Amino acid sequence: MSHAYPPDRNKSIAWAKHVLITRNRWVILDTETTGIGPRDEVIQIAVIDLKGTVRLDSYIQPIRRKKIPLAATAVHGITINMLQGASSYLELFPRLEKSVADRTIIAYNAEFDKQLLDQTARINQAQQLEASWACAMLQYARFVGEWLAFKQDYQWQKLPFAGHNALADCQAILDLIQKMAKTPMWRPK
């Protein structure tokens, strides 16, 4: 399939190159959750830097749920038994804050991860994470270039090679950024 507007693809390539050149300004974050609703919580979180070094990888004990819904477990494989002995979000927060300090967070569907982290903080009566965010999913949608006229925007794409494990997904996001950065720029003929 050809790109709807190749100069937009170039913008995503340029973004990916910029991220890799300024790698010390960024971290990649991913979460796994009990679901997608207003009562759901983050139960796994990982943060890596742009060299792939793990800054945080932890399960989190949920407060509201005593069982992980089967639909969520079917996606990420996490069961309530796996969370036995895990830190609470409140206990984990200082490590999370340190792992992203002074860096912009890149996430795949950043809006979702930010929303669920904010929600988890409220549920746990914890401080909300203060950070700048960038969305790799929106960049990748623009890179792929599948235009949806009714939305007047690019079709969101699934994360290639996603493992539905927070750490594996962080690595998949890094791999995707590297792939986009290596793509030759489109030049008009």
Where are the language model's segments positioned?
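Conserved non-catalytic scaffold segment of RNase H-like nuclease domains
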Residues: 2-130, 145, 152-160, 164
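Conserved beta-strand -> loop -> alpha-helix junction used to position metal-binding or nucleic-acid-contacting
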Residues: 127-141
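Short leucine-rich amphipathic alpha-helical surface patches
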Residues: 140-147, 181
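Acidic, divalent-metal-coordinating active-site segment for phosphoryl/phosphodiester hydrolysis
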Residues: 165-179
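The feature marks non-catalytic terminal segments
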Residues: 178-189
